Amino acid sequence: MNTLMEFNSSSLTTCHTFDKVVAFYTEHFSKVDRAIRNLYAAFLQEKAIIRPLQEYYESLNYELLQKWFEYRPEYQSDQQGYLISLFKNAKPRIAVIVGDGIRYEISEYIAQALEKKFKVDKQIMLADMPSETEHNMSALYVGNGEVLPVHKDREKRLTEISGKAITYMDLEALSYGDTADYLVLNYGDIDKAGEKLQQGAIKLFSEFELVLIDKITQLLNMGYQEVHLITDHGFVLTGVLDEADKLSPDATGTKEVHERFIRTIDKQSNSAWFGVKESHGEYNYVYAAKSHRPFKSKGCYGYSHGGVTPQEIIIPKFSFRKEKAATSELEVTISNKKESNEVIGDYFDIKLQADSKTTDLFASQRKVQILIYAGGVNISSSSIITMKSGERQSVEFSFQDNLEIIVVLLDVETREQLDVANIKKSNARDLGGLL
């Protein structure tokens, strides 16, 4: 609550360009957005408490929007074809998390949680208009203003244009042992929850943040040289909403009304709207209100996007990298990978080898653990193994009715992935030494 009530917006008066307004939002006002979101999560059902807080927030937001739309003509989205450009110039071992609805304040929280352990580069992207999923995911994956409704088609186009063998998966499916050189991970939980539960989803957002923190950490520990976090759009929250708060979609001619934007055939002259010329089916223009409030529509109110406020348009373009370690660690590897392509029988051995050439006193031993995966699921693991310089150890595991296994060797303390092996079960029968 203190962040909201003690916020000082005086520096907004010195913002005389669009870029300075953007900087004011990312450096200062995004904290207010986070504060009101947390207050909604705690008090949304207690109108006597939340309404005065919401009204104060809206007064601050009104000041911001006045400046935002004053310099809005300088706005130019840089979202079109972003992933194409990124992967064309990318080197192997790059992972990109493409979120749906990751507002800037969420990404800022994630970055603050990780910057103590990793190198964080915080850049911003300006989302396209209208700031909705189909339109802006197409902008990221395809570019040139082309909109592809089916996500698999966007992925196929990105692979074709970038010329890279990109692996696509849902973020939740990530597991140690994945070895793709170029990886795109989809994370749609924020937008899915928002669309389904509206403001009821607010209480879940902190869990989504923890998932992203955990997965970015895991990717870097798996050996990815850089992990990027981007999204299609942000969102606004309407809070306590009365019928009188909703905006009338008074457009002339044929129109298509959404909660945060309107498509029209004819050009409109409403000074309370911001519009651009954009063809979409039979429509020629798209308009959004110069406000965070929704149009009267068939949509569900609470969580929404599609408009052109800073909360919807200013989005993260963050990257994360590991700092070089100040001290060396004992190198431990799986030494029998070549012998594991065709294993006869229901059991297999994993042999570990610790480097014998180390001269660093602090690298004389290392605690490791072996994890066993089948179909992306962790089915078994070893106890913690302490490896000393030059030492060898062997651990036996069962296939557990699986034909193929991925073995992952982890550092116990850092959870860094040290080595990976693929183990395949042979179709030949184990004759127990009878031959």
Residue ranges and their predicted role:
Residues M1-L435:
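Feature captures the catalytic ectodomains and active-site-proximal regions of enzymes
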